[in-house]
Amino acid sequence: MLDKRCSGILLHPTSLPSRFGIGDLGDGAFQFIDFLADADQSVWQILPLGPTGFGNSPYLCYSALAINPWLISLDRLAEEGFLPPSLLDQAPPFTNPRVDYDQAIAYKSQVLKQAFAQFRTNIELAIEQEFAEFCQAQSDWLADYALFMAIKEAHNGAGWHQWDKDIAWREPEALKIWGDRLKTEVLYHQFLQFLGFRQWQEVKAYANQRHIAIFGDLPIYVAHDSADVWANPENFCLDPETGEAAMMAGVPPDYFSATGQLWGNPVYDWETLKATGFAWWIKRFKANLQYLDIVRIDHFRGFESYWGVPQGEKTAENGEWYPAPGKEFFQALGKALGDNLPIVAEDLGVITPEVEALRDEFNFPGMKVLHFAFDSDRGNPFLPFNYSNGNAVVYTGTHDNDTTVGWFQERSEDDQQKVINYLGCVCNEGIHWSLIRLASSSVAALAIFPLQDILGLGSDCRMNLPGTAAGNWGWRYHPDQLNDWLSGHLSFITELYGRRIYHTD
């Protein structure tokens, strides 16, 4: 899949600049693409784009197929006639330099409802037709998602398994009653998806026009409280009485955690999925490839075997390994989408030879993270001289790591010296540029750097601290932080290590 050496930047759209408290798909997105192009980058990596709930984690979404409506640019809606421009002039001040989820969601929700009212009363024929075509094109999932969100709001946010049994288990009469009762609310959520997809497709088209590929995340598991599970309960291991997860996903105890990690997502009923030819998974991939060029599968090892923890357990200690039909699944996916699947395998953690064999059979690139390269001896697989071939994506760090500056500062003097000994020296521009150079010089076909590392920022700017529920997903950059020196220096390194791709247009 990765047939040319190249590089790119990791930045979730919520981290883009905007004047409404959260990054969006407005001018900031287009300006960031221009920065990528000016720096001779070829890839923009993002986190999952789905609608987030409690905790604002993009890895815990109400749908694996929908787009987060809080990413919708209000300025662009005003430009397109969905809002009177004067309305946005009355916006409250957003003074928090980080994402202010509470204030941003409260304000944007109010304004988006006004856009919906404008859409319903002053609809243009062309927009009406475009909306109808969108709803038809996304009919596999959109109606279920919109009804799920409308019913959830009518239940004050309660999870679907807490609803009355008739609607929780989708009895036809209950679906009709709720659909009729919440017809306007369902239309509203369809409208938000129409706007979100419309704006994202314009962003993606501009990125592709500037020779930037969009590289996104696809978590293997979906949230229990999601339209995906509610609309397709047969695909998941659920308690038939309560609707709760009968078998929960996680990972077993290891050196880092004596009790393992219990994620709580329901694991898949792979026998049912296999009997349908993996139809739900194929639909999911097709939907994601509408707005992504490359897909990173989070927790890839779960396609070879997965750790299942019985209902009622409080930790992951008492789970078991269960086989998963990874080979059959990827064969079916290749048959549906073509053999050269644009997939990167997140193969971090405890990876067995069987997982590596599955990855290699389908020629999926794996991941290398330089922050993990200096924690053991010279056989460490993350050290660049141990990369067996170029079919890999190398990172300075990921969204789950500290920034490179923060990572280096937190190391002991002895550990810092190990890093310096390997590098030879720390370049004048700082440790972050030294690791960017190290990643760029490796044989890995694709090198990815979080924007925080390009900017040389510290621990206060990390995106996520795994295992913590608060304070994550909030970092944003200021537009003044991107400048000609940065793009020029990154372009120089990209050219120096053979990662610049030349284009004729």
From Swiss-Prot:
One Pfam family per UniProt: Glyco_hydro_77
Compartment(s) of residence: Cytoplasm
Protein name: 4-alpha-glucanotransferase
Species of origin: Synechocystis sp. (strain ATCC 27184 / PCC 6803 / Kazusa)
Gene3D superfamilies associated with the record: Glycosidases
Lineage per the UniProt record: Bacteria, Bacillati, Cyanobacteriota, Cyanophyceae, Synechococcales
Gene Ontology MF terms: 4-alpha-glucanotransferase activity
EC number: 2.4.1.25
Entries under SUPFAM superfamilies matching the protein: (Trans)glycosidases (SSF51445)
Any one biological process term the GO annotation gives: carbohydrate metabolic process
Catalytic activity line of the entry: Transfers a segment of a (1->4)-alpha-D-glucan to a new position in an acceptor, which may be glucose or a (1->4)-alpha-D-glucan
Gene Ontology cellular component list: cytoplasm
Keywords, ordered alphabetically: Carbohydrate metabolism, Cytoplasm, Glycosyltransferase, Transferase
Family per similarity comment: Belongs to the disproportionating enzyme family.
